[in-house]
Amino acid sequence: MRFVDEVVIKLQAGKGGNGCVSFRREKYVPRGGPDGGDGGNGGSIYLKADENVNTLIDYRYKREYYAENGRPGEGRNCYGKAGEDLYLVVPVGTSVFDIDTNKKIGEVLQHGQTFKLVSGGKRGIGNTHFKSSTNQAPRKFTLGEEGEYKEVRLELNLLADVALLGLPNAGKSTLIRSVSEATPKVADYPFTTMYPHLGVVKVGVDSFVMADIPGVIEGAAEGAGLGLRFLKHLTRARCVLHVVDICPFNESDPVENYFAVEKELEKYSQELFDKPRFLVINKIDLLADKVEQKCQEFVEQIGYQGNYYTISAAMKKGTDELAKKLNEFLQKQE
């Protein structure tokens, strides 16, 4: 299924039903009083989060949504039926932005959580309500109000504990495959990963969610490559793994590659740049000798002061230990 994380839709809540003008007419009661009932309220439209949904693709092809109108009131003080509410099912982590103001107006972050997008119109009232001592046979009633209309943008930000960051072909997809049951495409060419993937990493009785996004290239913060579109999925992660290919097949410099990604991350969002971040040196199986020494030299060259991990995602070397350390970090954050 294609991954879609941003759509624009139009919403029209239901109109309220009109009030009714009616008078009681029964045998032996030829001039009964007013008995016109109220109309029904118009239906509203809600977002509803579902953990089993992971894309907004359904809203790419259908862009307009209408809630049901309320029914008009009837005689004998019968109220009209309220319009049925409409629920739009979306992935957990979906935010809503008003197109006119471009402001965020809501979000759904937990399974089953709802958020009202537009409100149904208020019902009209029947002539029963207008009876008075001076007007025993009122013909006055009110119309139901129009339902609210709004055009909104839905944006999905994946909810993950750990996000993978790095250049294309750094081995991020191989890493998430090696520690979870996620199955992103893996190949020896850049941009194999076209859309984000989530994987659940299990460590004993604990588990956490890891996200793999398309690789970042120079200029991503300005929209180059696929990076800009998907960097937003890192914003809700609790920590970021910067995955570096220590032995690039294109013979590029790992040091320059590291700083290129760090530069784009800082340009895109200072908040994201300040998140807890760990260095993962990948593809150590491709180093002919002195693996530990070469990795240490790389760390010194980039001036990295934090914890770092050396792995071969393809050979699953060091990946279990990495998963354990990440789980320990996440447990301490709770």
Curated annotation (Swiss-Prot):
GO annotation terms (biological process): ribosome biogenesis
Swiss-Prot/TrEMBL cofactor(s): Mg(2+)
Gene3D superfamilies: GTP1/OBG domain, P-loop containing nucleotide triphosphate hydrolases
Record InterPro entries: G_OBG (IPR031167), GTP-bd (IPR006073), GTP-bd_Obg/CgtA (IPR014100), GTP1-OBG_CS (IPR006074), GTP1_OBG_dom (IPR006169), GTP1_OBG_dom_sf (IPR036726), OBG_GTPase (IPR045086), P-loop_NTPase (IPR027417)
EC number, UniProt record: 3.6.5.-
Key words, A-Z: Cytoplasm, GTP-binding, Hydrolase, Magnesium, Metal-binding, Nucleotide-binding
GO CC list: cytoplasm
Ranges in a coiled coil: none
UniProt GO MF annotations: GTP binding; GTPase activity; magnesium ion binding
Record-annotated OBG-type G domain positions: 160-331
PROSITE patterns associated with the record: G_OBG, GTP1_OBG, OBG
Keyword Nucleotide-binding assigned: yes
Amino acids binding GTP: 166-173, 191-195, 212-215, 282-285, 312-314
Main enzyme class: hydrolase
Predominant location: cytoplasm
Limits of the Obg domain: 1-159
Intracellular or extracellular location(s): Cytoplasm
Sequence positions that bind Mg(2+): 173, 193
Sequence similarity: Belongs to the TRAFAC class OBG-HflX-like GTPase superfamily. OBG GTPase family.
HAMAP family according to UniProt: GTPase_Obg
Function: An essential GTPase which binds GTP, GDP and possibly (p)ppGpp with moderate affinity, with high nucleotide exchange rates and a fairly low GTP hydrolysis rate. Plays a role in control of the cell cycle, stress response, ribosome biogenesis and in those bacteria that undergo differentiation, in morphogenesis control.
Subunit organization: Monomer.
Protein name in the entry: GTPase Obg
Species of origin: Francisella tularensis subsp. tularensis (strain SCHU S4 / Schu 4)
